Swiss-Prot record:
Transmembrane segments: none annotated. The gene is NS. This is Nuclear export protein. The keyword Transport applies. SUPFAM superfamilies: Nonstructural protein ns2, Nep, M1-binding domain. GO terms for biological process: exit of virus from host cell nucleus through nuclear pore. It comes from Influenza A virus (strain A/Hong Kong/1/1968 H3N2). Interacts with protein M1. May interact with host nucleoporin RAB/HRB and exportin XPO1/CRM1. Keywords: Host nucleus, Host-virus interaction, Transport, Virion. GO terms for cellular component: host cell nucleus; virion component.
């Protein structure tokens, strides 16, 4: 796993957890939870690719791993739209920078998960 990706996830999660967005704090907590879940999923796929023979193990653990993969891509698309919406509505520069970095990270992670999944197929 790329150490820059790890630190990017940690940095963005830390900064998002410090934000106070008024009535939408529940939505933000949901985004943070999904970011954390996405990071764990990306890490597990990356580890499976590193072991290359782990495809059968992955399939045995989760017989519907392709369906789960599709769900993760849906989550990524939802997060991208949510982050874009936040970017358009916030005027706070700290929040804008955080959401811009989160958006870039989501695009990078989406590409990494696509790469990992093609290697596993």
């Amino acid at each position: 796993m790329d150490s820059n990706t790890v630190s990017s996830f940690q940095d963005i999660l830390l900064r998002m957890s410090k934000m106070q967005l008024g009535s939408s704090s529940e939505d933000l907590n949901g985004m943070i939870t999904q970011f954390e879940s996405l990071k764990l999923y990306r890490d597990s796929l990356g580890e499976a690719v590193m072991r290359m023979g782990d495809l059968h193990s992955l399939q045995n653990r989760n017989g519907k791993w392709r369906e789960q993969l599709g769900q993760k891509f849906e989550e990524i698309r939802w997060l991208i739209e949510e982050v874009r919406h936040r970017l358009k509505t916030t005027e706070n520069s700290f929040e804008q920078i955080t959401f811009m970095q989160a958006l870039q990270l989501l695009f990078e992670v989406e590409q990494e998960i696509r790469t990992f999944s093609f290697q596993l197929i």
